[in-house]
Regions:
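Active-site/substrate-binding loop(s) of hydrolase catalytic cores
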Residues: 85-88, 100-225, 243-246, 250, ...
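Short glycine/serine/proline-enriched coil/turn segments at secondary-structure junctions
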Residues: 66, 81-84, 98
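Short beta-strand-to-loop junctions in surface cap/lid or active-site-entrance loops
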Residues: 73-85
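Alpha-helix termini
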Residues: 80-81, 114-119, 284-288
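Glycine-/small-residue-rich active-site loops that bind phosphorylated ligands and cofactors
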Residues: 97-98, 262
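Active-site-adjacent mobile loop/cap segments within catalytic or ligand-binding domains
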Residues: 230-291
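Short glycine- and acidic-rich boundary segments immediately preceding or forming the N-terminal edge
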Residues: 2-75
Length: 291
């Protein structure tokens, strides 16, 4: 990554090299269809959290599945310890267990936050890279219960993962929610913009940024929804989102990569799109302050 002047990495060269090497190893294993234990899959982020002054790791909770502990990992990024208002954004991946590209892309993005600190200025980010750990371990879209967790939100679901994520989202009252997915029927990268017009204004440049890595899905109908230049303004019911009664509403964006594209290209597209969303949102806030 070209950091440019005044954008010195918050990681030492040694720590950065360790994180990058772990990321290469994880990508290699995933590309070869090898199932990694959760802690091995998340190794790049776990190493980064050991060395970074800005990233810390914990979980929403731990439970036992088939005799082994599983958990929903959570990572928190804040560039400095200065107490001030920050834009609160939650970024979620792995709600479908058979979509590893979003997990890898999100880990790359968190590494970029340390390597180019200006990127995270004015933000407090809450990162949830594996929201469906039992689905990941089974390599299935659904969780171990057979439920598609991304159709269960705000419906009084009995699914443990959904209940924990709902509680987290309700408590955080995010200014923005971003979800990462992959579509095995898509020829290119696209996204959903939900909420007010801001989501669409953020998504359009994010898709343009992702085009450095993957083509845009320009079909007029995507996944059964009307689309314009890769942007869909409708969505399925029960998806991961803010509580129905949250006011003001956050911007909500869903990024979708073409699942059959090379994993390296998908992860790069996710990173580029996420970087664009933060950059464009910061411009929006600055513009509003000048009005």
């Amino acid at each position: 990554m070209n950091r440019g002047p005044g954008r010195e990495s918050l990681l030492s060269p040694r720590a950065s090299a360790k994180v990058q090497e772990a990321a290469r190893l994880v990508l290699d294993r995933v590309e070869k269809q090898r199932l990694l234990p959760l802690k091995n899959l998340l190794l790049p982020l776990l190493i980064q959290s050991l060395y970074s002054p800005c990233v810390r790791a914990d979980s929403l909770g731990v439970w036992e599945h088939q005799g082994e502990p599983v958990w929903i990992p959570r990572f928190h990024f804040r560039r400095t310890q200065v107490i001030k208002h920050r834009i609160q954004v939650g970024i979620f991946a792995g709600i479908h267990g058979d979509e590893p590209a979003g997990i890898l892309g999100l880990m790359d993005f968190v590494r970029a936050l340390d390597e180019a600190p200006e990127l995270g200025r004015n933000f407090e980010l809450w990162i949830y890279p594996v929201c469906n750990p039992t689905g990941y371990l089974a390599r299935t879209r659904e969780s171990h219960s057979g439920k598609d967790l991304n159709r269960e939100f705000w419906k009084g679901s009995a699914e443990r993962e959904v209940q924990w994520i709902e509680k987290e989202i309700a408590a955080r009252q995010f200014d923005g929610i971003i979800s990462l997915h992959s579509d095995d029927t898509a020829p290119g990268f696209y996204g959903f913009a939900r909420g007010d017009v801001l989501a669409k204004q953020l998504l359009a440049p994010a898709l343009a940024a992702a085009e450095q890595s993957l083509p845009r899905d320009s079909r007029a109908s995507i996944d059964g929804f009307e689309a314009v230049n890769g942007i869909i303004e409708a969505a399925y019911g029960g998806i991961l989102s803010a509580p129905p009664d949250q006011k003001p509403r956050p911007f909500e964006i869903i990024l979708e990569s073409p699942a059959l594209a090379p994993l390296a290209a998908q992860r790069q597209a996710f990173r580029l799109a996420l970087e664009s969303i933060l950059s464009e949102y910061r411009k929006f806030i600055a513009y509003g302050a000048d009005l």
